[in-house]
Amino acid sequence: MKFNLILLFTLFFSSQFILAQHTLGNPNLIEHLNEFSKTSSITGREKQAASYIQDLFQKGELKKDRLGNLIMVLGSGHPKRLITVPLDEPGYVISHIQQDGFIKLNPLGFGYIGNLYHQFIQGHEVIINTETESLIGVSTVRSAHFDGVRANPESMKSPFSWHEIYLDVGATSASELATRNIQLLDPVTLNKKPVTINNSYVAAPSIKSKAAAIALAVVAKSIKEIEFKGTVVFAWTTLELLNGKGIEAVINNYGPFNEIHRFNRFLESKKIGKETLLANNLISKKGSNLVKTKPVIDFRNPASTINFNSENIYEIGLPSLYENSPVELVAVSDVENMIDYWLKVLDINVKETEVPQLKHETSKTSYDSFNEEHNLVSKLIGKYGVSYDEGSVRKLILNELPNWAKPKIDRVGNIVLTFGKGKEHIAFVAHMDETGYFVNSISDDGRLILKMRGRMFPWIWEAQPALVHTDKNPIQGVFEPRADYRNSLTRLSSEPLKVFAGFNSKNEALAAGIKIGVTTVTMPKEMIRISENRAAARGFDDRVGSAALLKSLKDLNPNELSQRVTFIWSVAEEAGLIGSTFAAKNLTDISTVYPIDTYVSSDDPYSDESFANSPLGDGAVIRVLESINFLSRKNLKKIQTIANKNEIKVQYGMTAGGTDGQAFLGYGIPSIPLSWPGRYSHSPVEVMDYRDLNSLTSLISAIIKNPSNN
């Protein structure tokens, strides 16, 4: 992920804000908070964040020293004051590259507060900043389907630690990683997904210090053409979470100072949006409401040449919620208040503070192959459809059907498409729904209390962005971390998952269209390519199966078939095979059903290869044995014969879980489940291989065109 910023410095009134008159956040300020929060800047590798700040100024206005600090000096004489904020953030470096292509990490520096800090990276996208580019990968998680057969279930474990982290970037060997320029000690962070709530709050990793850096840039830009008494040094410093030498170098090289005003990310208060700021050492400034607060941890200053307990060093902080989590949240009004405070510290009266407009371009790694496959599956992934709420998925599938198709929607919402002629009647079924949550109740303070649909690891959803799906537009929010996330001793929380979406009361939530028992809640999702052959997303189960059915229709002429074929895109499979149960009752003349669903593979860095060992990239999978079905030798040989005849690469094996085929077994209809191998089931980072999708599509097409083998 690269940020190419084109900044427009000729500003209209709409791109300015008057601090005293604002209730909602300034749009330009919010945009900068969002964009800057996406930058990766682990301590000692702050280049991306520094480049963003530099691009806010004209060339030469900021000086970059040998440690990477950014400095701007304005004015002359006394008093001499320093205002400083950190550029760095907590993060990881690559500590080991395995021969099988998986990557191990080690945390860098300090600032990892709370027992769940590393758990919040499990099962989510990451950014690896190589020497030449930013690459995307996933932090792996054990497949949820296997938890019932594990001797030590995930839900019974202590919190996830950094020692357990494995990264998957779609590589199969260490040499493949080398060709992509991934090396030891490359920095790694979460792939950050900032959330704006009600145009009043912004949530993102390390948003307090990120917001402070933007606020300081606004102050510096606003006064650089104004005459004032004394000297002001603005500094965006490096290395704070490693050794503190960034700020130390600025003080030694640009001091001595009469006053030093330092942003302290470790000052905490939950009183957001109350026009208060936090202070370690109080300084009386008219109009500023400072609350004395002690930091939760101290800075590390090894072998320091500076007395950081000096009386002329004043520390300021921002109130926030969910501190030190991926959804650390600040009020935009508090960021504006910090800008106002720093101007008062400098005794400078600025009526209007300029926030530059921002235009940005995000360049992504391009790939040469499987673009058609990616585009189709990506469109399906882009639609949300928790069980019983599949409407948008259904609409897309209907739009993707060929012109000759005459689909029907049955009473429960399944898409049923029958074509071809003949006595023999076979069916294929893939489900449209995905796992997720629905609103089970609403608390008096407006929090949405959730209940799960499907089987997942609920801790993976804690402290992540949320989308609340109403009848109108989705509402952004955050999945709150559990109340004791700092001190929790268990991986699984005993509390129900909750969402904060900016509501202050139950009535506000109801007025916004939240319906108890109906409204569904998910994470935002987007399909990402992690290598030439592989992609990751939440919801491949079963959007890949849905895509395989659609692809098999592309070049099909139904008039050439000598058997009847029914395709079913079913609803609510994850909630108990609701759609397929209804379909099976009405399609009892079917001779064989082929459920098209995920094969949960042990092809991951955790699992025993003696179970479900069907590697990604080795072709479609015949699910011979699963939790609810054991395929006959006759039917296995039948599918293998079709595959061999058509030179289709297939695998076969056993795995956990079941499919829509179970509903048809009750009517005496044999079920032959066909799948693609997938990693990290029912997580936000399920991984698939495009080659397996194509193999599965070819197998479906061959079965349709080979009635004598059915």
Language model region names:
Residues 1-6:
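Positively charged n-region of N-terminal signal peptides that target proteins for export
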Residues 14-15:
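N-terminal signal peptide c-region/cleavage motif recognized by signal peptidases
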Residues 19-710:
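N-terminal hydrophobic/helix-forming segments and targeting peptides
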